[in-house]
């Protein structure tokens, strides 16, 4: 955790340096010309994709909910929002919302709905390529028959594709694009090994494949489409988290 705090502090300092330019009446206030943020990933970048139904009700009662953060429930920000504030650029909204919980949970959900003009595509539980993310609604069907939250878990590949569709197939070059993904691939593979469904060696190979795929997607679907400022964040040290 100490290592993660140090990295975030360094990242914030770098953004502050980039944001030191004088503000003009006809453009961004930072020297690199960033005027928007686009985010892809999983729960660590999700700003409310699941803040619907019963989850939204909890939010009304507590001042928060639908966000994966240990920060204050009222006004607590995740890292993408802090970076947006430092640049400064507008904080965007979830590009898709929805939840399809199993009936046994007693929770109500909402249809999966795309949100026009919103460019945070990150969703809790999402993997790099596979749609079968952590707590995915797809696991509710046979042969899995899981009782779970029914998360959308749109994979990062599809998140990037959705943005290209929404933005006319390219980037302006003035966005800060953030990518943080891969942890859920590790978790799913770890669970598969624990269940005896595959060997540790196969799991390591699958995780390496996901990492290579992520790099390829960033090159072909982000950089090659005109993005100039791309921030790819390494996975946190999972062994130092409560899960690890």
How does the language model describe each region?
Residues 20-244:
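Conserved active-site regions of diverse hydrolases
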């Amino acid at each position: 955790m100490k290592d993660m705090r140090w990295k975030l502090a360094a990242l914030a300092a770098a953004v502050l340096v980039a944001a030191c330019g004088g503000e003009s009446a006809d453009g961004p206030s930072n020297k690199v010309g960033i005027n928007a943020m686009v985010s892809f990933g999983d729960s660590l970048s999700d700003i409310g994709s699941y803040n619907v139904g019963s989850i939204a009700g909890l939010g009304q009662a507590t001042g928060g909910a639908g966000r994966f953060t240990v920060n204050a429930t009222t006004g607590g920000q995740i890292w993408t929002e802090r970076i947006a504030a430092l640049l400064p650029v507008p904080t965007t909204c979830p590009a898709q919302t929805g939840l399809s919980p199993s009936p046994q949970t007693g929770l109500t959900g909402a249809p999966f709905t795309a949100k026009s003009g919103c460019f945070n595509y990150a969703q809790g539980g999402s993997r790099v390529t596979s749609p079968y993310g952590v707590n995915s609604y797809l696991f509710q069907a046979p042969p899995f028959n899981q009782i779970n939250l029914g998360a959308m878990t749109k994979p990062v590949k599809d998140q990037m594709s959705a943005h290209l569709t929404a933005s006319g197939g390219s980037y302006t070059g003035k966005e800060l694009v953030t990518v943080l993904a891969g942890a859920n691939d590790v978790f799913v593979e770890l669970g598969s090994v624990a269940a005896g469904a595959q060997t540790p060696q196969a799991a390591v190979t699958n995780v390496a494949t996901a990492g290579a795929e992520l790099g390829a997607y960033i090159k072909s679907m982000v950089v090659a489409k005109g993005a100039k400022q791309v921030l790819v964040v390494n996975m946190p040290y999972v062994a130092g988290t409560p899960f690890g």
